[in-house]
């Protein structure tokens, strides 16, 4: 099996069935998902929102962390998606409360070798 096959399966299922369900403990809380899909030859970043999705080939360093990162730089998307995917779909309150942007930046810095892993992660 390949990353392309996994990508096709996930996007087909999201388009057909949607995703999610209540993941809150005491109240309703829903969020969308992102995936890093890889095999020995290639890798993809897939971000989703409801039944919508956008994907691009992964660069040398990629991270996901409870926030959308694809702007208009995706290579393929579900029907009806155009422009800035993040701007159209990101829940800014959830992203801020979760500290997602800081955590994503810290994990990217660690993977890029831009600092001491423990110090960077403690700042996130």
Place the predicted regions along the sequence by residue:
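Short alpha-helical interface elements
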Residues: 20-22, 31, 62
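Short, structured protein-protein interaction patches enriched in aromatics and acidic/basic residues
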Residues: 24-42
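A conserved hydrophobic secondary-structure block that centers on an alpha-helix together
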Residues: 2-24
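C-terminal, well-structured catalytic/ligand-binding subdomain of enzymes
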Residues: 1, 38-124
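Non-transmembrane, interaction-prone segments in cytosolic or luminal domains
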Residues: 6, 21-27, 112, 119-124
